[in-house]
A protein has these predicted regions:
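Internal acidic/polar
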Residues: 90-115, 146
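DNA-recognition helix of helix-turn-helix
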Residues: 81, 125, 133, 142, ...
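N-terminal module of bacterial RNA polymerase sigma factors
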Residues: 1-29, 170, 174, 181
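Arg/Lys-rich amphipathic alpha helix in sigma70-family domain 2
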Residues: 60-64, 74-95, 115
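Structural recognition of an alpha-helix C-terminal capping motif at a helix-to-coil junction
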Residues: 32, 46-53, 66-78
Length: 181
């Protein structure tokens, strides 16, 4: 049982501090992951909060069949996709100045994760590739999920995920003009 699942088990047994540990472990990564879908920091934070509320309100849905991180990121993905689907019908195009301000806020959140010029170039390249490639690379390399766990989040087979990661790395290399990531 992974550390997150152990903390969740303690929470279910009445240890309220364990929920704080779970939030501390996964909150920032989950917000960054959801942000890739919704492209709005406030919405990403709200959806991440909804994921943690889901853990409290519906504990029976987890079932300890996968790692807690996989379950949390699957919930995050589902909530983000639902949100984007609903918003695409009603949301006007975002003001560019507002978008820049959000990106500045996001940079503050990411500042301890992303360092240096190479990482900036890498993220620009990641933003330019197909959504499935970007999601696969994010889950495997930034969130450090196994191929099996990441495949579960994306509703793909491990082989399909392996192909997405390979193609994503190739696309990023081509965009960066380098031979290695």
């Amino acid at each position: 049982m992974d550390k997150g699942a152990q903390s969740y088990r303690r929470f279910l047994d009445g240890d309220d501090d364990a929920l704080g540990e779970i939030v501390d472990m996964y909150r920032e990564g989950l917000i960054l992951f959801i942000y890739r879908y919704v492209e709005n920091l406030a919405d990403a934070e709200d959806l991440a909060e909804d994921v943690f509320v889901e853990l409290i309100v519906n504990p029976e849905r987890y079932g300890f069949r996968s790692s807690l991180k996989t379950y949390i990121f699957t919930l995050g993905r589902n909530k983000a996709v639902d949100f984007v689907r609903k918003q695409s019908k009603i949301r006007p195009v975002q003001d560019p100045e507002e978008r820049l301000a959000e990106l500045a806020d996001l940079h503050t959140l990411e500042s301890h994760i992303i360092r240096g010029e190479e990482n900036r170039r890498l993220y620009e390249a990641l933003d330019s590739i197909k959504e499935d490639y970007r999601t696969a690379l994010h889950l495997v390399y930034l969130e450090e999920l196994s191929y099996k766990e990441a495949a579960g989040v994306m509703k793909k087979t491990p082989k399909q995920l392996e192909n997405l990661v390979g193609r994503g790395k190739k696309a990023v290399r081509e965009l960066m003009g380098e031979e290695g990531i």
